[in-house]
Amino acid sequence: MVMLISLSFKKVIWMNVDPNLTKYMIKAKIYTDGVVEKPDVVGAIFGQTEGLLGDDLDLRDLQKSGKIGRIEVEIDSKKGRTEGYALIPSGLDQVETAILAAALETIDRIGPCKAKVEIANVEDVRVQKRQKIIERAKKIYQDMNSKGDDLSESLVKSVREEVEKSEIISYGEEKLPAGPAINDSDSIIVVEGRNDVLNLLKYGIKNTIAVQGTNIPETVKKLSKERTVTVFLDGDRGGDLILKEMLQVAEADFVARAPPGTEVEELTYKQIVKALRYKTPIDQYLSMHGMNDELKEYSQRNNLVFGSQPNNNHEAKAEVIEEPPEQPPKNEEIREEQSQQVTVQKEGFLDLLNPHEVSKRIEALAQLKMTEVYDSNGERIFSFPVSEAVERISQDPRGNTIVTGGIISQRLIDVSYNAGIKNIYGLKLGHITKKPVDINVIAWERSL
């Protein structure tokens, strides 16, 4: 009960505390062996400390001068006894407040009853004030930062947008959105819309032009015959349609795509750089994605020689390579088949420009765990197990193309590049961190 009283009383006291006066709050616990009232407690405090501490610390004089606040008392009487608290606000320094608190414990009578006074604590009121100040300052600081960041970001964004808008130009008869370098650059990047051009401008790429839909403008058709063209498209069906239209009416040298399901206008700087760095030559892109009809039509229309009709010898030797069986053969059969394959095709040919034939060969080599090296005419120079590929290529740097049934690793790319290899075809890509621009790397899952 005393606890409840003291808590509620504390609220009352804090409302009466003068914040300009109080430094410390003396909390004295009171016990009497009889029933007393509040005026008895206040009278005992003033009466029994009078003259005890000298004139400088006389409670009446201190209260008149404002150095001691109003004494608040909360007591409760039960079963002939009284307990409670007295709270004394002090504007004195630490030493004087401590002396005053100690003097209160000399009180031995309150009214007609024996009494005992104990100092429960002396609380530094300024600590709570400081804590409130800290909490409030944190909130104010957070609000300031939030508004400041918003303002800063807004200013930067506004300036950037204005700069980008001032840089974008209208090009050609169709007034196509384009970057300011479109007139002078030997290579151009063809994108879908105005926002794509703006996004690339934001990261300093200025040789861009937008087709504004699937109907390729005459301006872009003309530019494609004069410049090196990279088609940089969204990773969705719309990008596929624009690419097909581009192949039918214009020319393209490389293809770069946004990640599946994303648009060029959404890409970050890192994503843009990665996509353009690993752009794929148009013929390799079409073959890799199974667009054989488009590849054939594109090649014929642009008078390109992409592969040749296989002669009878090629067909006969290609038939030796069979599709891998559904059930893997026993180890003895694998070794025998591997030996036969190497023997029969030691002097064989592979149409390296025929994606279907290359794919079949990779599947067969994956079953055999073998790697083969071919010259530029598609004639096989030698073959060896996948595990020996890096060592064998570094020891005998011959050939133009590697076809492997294993994983294309970074080490294999590095060694092949040093050996003068131009193409690597494989089943899967390992962890690739860099690829020289002079070597083509194609896996049937993805390409670099």
UniProtKB/Swiss-Prot annotation:
Domain spans labelled Toprim: 186-260
Reaction catalysis annotation: ssDNA + n NTP = ssDNA/pppN(pN)n-1 hybrid + (n-1) diphosphate
Region (Disordered): 318-340
Binding residue positions for Mg(2+) 2: D234, D236
EC number: 2.7.7.101
Composition skew (Basic and acidic residues), residue ranges: 329-338
Family designation: Belongs to the archaeal DnaG primase family.
The protein, known as: DNA primase DnaG
Organism: Thermoplasma acidophilum (strain ATCC 25905 / DSM 1728 / JCM 9062 / NBRC 15155 / AMRC-C165)
Protein's gene: dnaG
